[in-house]
Amino acid sequence: MSIPTVKAKLLQGRKGLIVGIANDRSIAWGRARAFRALGAEIAVTYLNDKALPLV
């Protein structure tokens, strides 16, 4: 699935924390991709070390 291209970096200069990424199909993962595409700097947490390869 691709994220639509947005010319404006609406979140440029903003910082965010995305918690609870479980895999590449989770809502948190989708938010992280979208926020990053809009220019935000993000930090993420994930379920556990077993989930790391999926993130």
UniProtKB/Swiss-Prot annotation:
Catalyzes what?
a 2,3-saturated acyl-[ACP] + NAD(+) = a (2E)-enoyl-[ACP] + NADH + H(+)
**Record carries keyword Nucleotide-binding:** no
Q: Does the keyword Lipid metabolism apply?
A: yes
Instruction: Look up the record and name the pathway of this protein.
Output: Lipid metabolism; fatty acid biosynthesis
Q: Which Pfam families match?
A: adh_short_C2
Which GO BP terms sit in this record? Answer: fatty acid elongation
GO MF entry, a single one: identical protein binding
Cite the entry's keywords alphabetically: Fatty acid biosynthesis, Fatty acid metabolism, Lipid biosynthesis, Lipid metabolism, NAD, Oxidoreductase
Sequence positions that bind NAD(+): 20, 26-27
InterPro entries, per the entry: NAD(P)-bd_dom_sf, SDR_fam
So what EC number does this one have?
1.3.1.9
Q: Which domain of life is it from?
A: Bacteria
Quaternary state and partners of this protein? Answer: Homotetramer.
- Family label: Belongs to the short-chain dehydrogenases/reductases (SDR) family. FabI subfamily.
> What's its job?
Catalyzes the reduction of a carbon-carbon double bond in an enoyl moiety that is covalently linked to an acyl carrier protein (ACP). Involved in the elongation cycle of fatty acid which are used in the lipid metabolism.
This protein is called Enoyl-[acyl-carrier-protein] reductase [NADH] FabI
Which gene underlies this protein?
Answer: fabI
